[in-house]
């Protein structure tokens, strides 16, 4: 419920006036960013995940400072590649541990991302 979200967020901000940053651990950072922007609060840094259209809009208007992007296309590609290697070529996979790059997207480097 958007009204309840706004009420809860503003109660939290008012109870924690010294807060300087918020880390949103999912792709919905735009919800908090939009509320703070609507209320004229622009001195809180917001970091969130994923380059969604709403988060991209907030990066562009400065209400989100940074996004951590996990390259879902590459994750999917690597999963399919491992499955093909195992099912068709009978090769052992790398196990259950894979390292993946994480991009930090900000206003300055946003144009380099789709």
Q: How would you describe each model-predicted region?
A:
Residues 1-53:
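Hydrophobic alpha-helical
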Residues 41, 61-62, 99:
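Short, well-ordered coil/turn elements that cap or connect secondary structure elements
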Residues 27, 54, 74-78:
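Conserved active-site and cofactor/substrate-binding residues in soluble primary-metabolism enzymes
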């Amino acid at each position: 419920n958007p009204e309840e979200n706004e009420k809860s967020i503003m109660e939290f901000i008012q109870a924690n006036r010294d807060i300087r940053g918020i880390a949103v651990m999912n792709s919905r950072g735009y919800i908090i960013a939009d509320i703070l922007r609507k209320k004229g609060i622009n001195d809180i840094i917001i970091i969130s995940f994923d380059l969604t259209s709403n988060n991209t809009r907030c990066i562009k208007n400065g209400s989100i400072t940074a996004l951590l992007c996990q390259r879902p296309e590459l994750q999917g590609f690597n999963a399919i590649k491992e499955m093909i290697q195992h099912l068709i070529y009978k090769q052992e996979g790398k196990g259950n541990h894979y390292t993946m790059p994480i991009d930090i997207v900000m206003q300055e480097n946003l144009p380099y991302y789709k």
